[in-house]
C-alpha cells in the first residue's frame, strides 16, 4: 500500500506543467486561493485588464481593416491605369485611321475604324463601372469608420475611469483624447479621378 502511494506521488510530481497559448508554462498555485478559485487557469501576464485586452484587440482589427482597404485601393489603381493605357493605344490607332481621307480608305480600314470605336466605348464603360465601385466602397468604409469610432469611444470611457489614479485625475483637467485611427493618405476614388478625370475619361 505504501509503495503504491509512493509511486502515485512520484508520477504526480513528474507531470508536465500545463500550457496555455504562447505562455511556456502555467504553474498551479493553490496557496492562498479559495475553493472556487482552484480551477481557474490564467495566463502569466495578469497586468492587463479585460477591458484593455478587448480595446487592443479592436485596434488590431482596425489596423487589419486599413491594410485590406489599402490593398483594395491599389488594385483599383492598377486596373484604372491599365484601362487608361488601353484606351490611349486604341485612340492613337483610331486617329491614324481618321487622318486618312474617306475616299482613300479601304474596306478593311473602315471595318477596323468601327471596331476601334466599339472597343473604346466598351473600355470607357468598364472604367465608369470601376469608378462607381470605388464610390460604393468609399461609402461602406465611411460607415465602418463611424461604427468603429463609436465602439472605441464607448470602450475608452469606462477604461479611463478605472485606470486613472486619484493623483493623475487631480493633475489632469482635460481627459486625454482617444488615439487617432490609422488613415490612408488618399482614397482609391480620388486617385482614380486624378488619372483621367471624374467618371468620364478625359482622353475621350
Curated annotation (Swiss-Prot):
Record InterPro entries: bMERB_dom (IPR022735), C16orf45-like (IPR040127)
A GO CC term assigned to this protein in UniProt: microtubule cytoskeleton
Stretches the record annotates as Disordered: 162-187
Domain bMERB residues, every copy: 3-150
Gene Ontology biological-process entries: negative regulation of microtubule depolymerization
PROSITE patterns, per database record: BMERB
Protein name: bMERB domain-containing protein 1
Organism: Pongo abelii
Gene name for this UniProt entry: BMERB1
Amino acid at each position: 500500500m505504501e509503495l503504491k502511494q509512493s509511486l502515485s506521488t512520484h508520477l504526480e510530481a513528474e507531470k508536465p506543467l500545463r500550457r496555455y497559448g504562447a505562455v511556456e508554462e502555467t504553474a498551479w498555485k493553490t496557496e492562498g486561493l479559495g475553493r472556487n478559485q482552484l480551477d481557474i487557469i490564467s495566463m502569466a501576464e495578469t497586468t492587463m485588464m479585460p477591458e484593455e485586452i478587448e480595446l487592443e484587440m479592436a485596434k488590431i482589427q482596425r489596423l487589419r481593416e486599413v491594410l485590406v482597404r489599402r490593398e483594395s485601393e491599389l488594385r483599383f489603381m492598377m486596373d484604372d491605369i491599365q484601362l487608361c493605357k488601353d484606351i490611349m493605344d486604341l485612340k492613337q490607332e483610331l486617329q491614324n485611321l481618321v487622318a486618312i481621307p474617306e475616299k482613300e480608305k479601304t474596306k478593311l480600314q473602315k471595318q477596323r475604324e468601327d471596331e476601334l470605336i466599339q472597343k473604346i466605348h466598351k473600355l470607357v464603360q468598364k472604367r465608369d463601372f470601376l469608378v462607381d465601385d470605388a464610390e460604393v466602397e468609399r461609402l461602406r468604409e465611411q460607415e465602418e469608420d463611424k461604427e468603429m469610432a463609436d465602439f472605441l469611444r464607448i470602450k475608452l470611457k469606462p477604461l479611463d475611469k478605472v485606470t486613472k489614479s486619484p493623483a493623475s485625475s487631480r493633475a489632469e483637467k482635460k481627459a486625454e483624447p482617444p488615439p487617432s485611427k490609422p488613415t490612408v493618405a488618399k482614397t482609391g476614388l480620388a486617385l482614380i479621378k486624378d488619372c483621367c478625370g471624374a467618371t468620364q475619361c478625359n482622353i475621350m
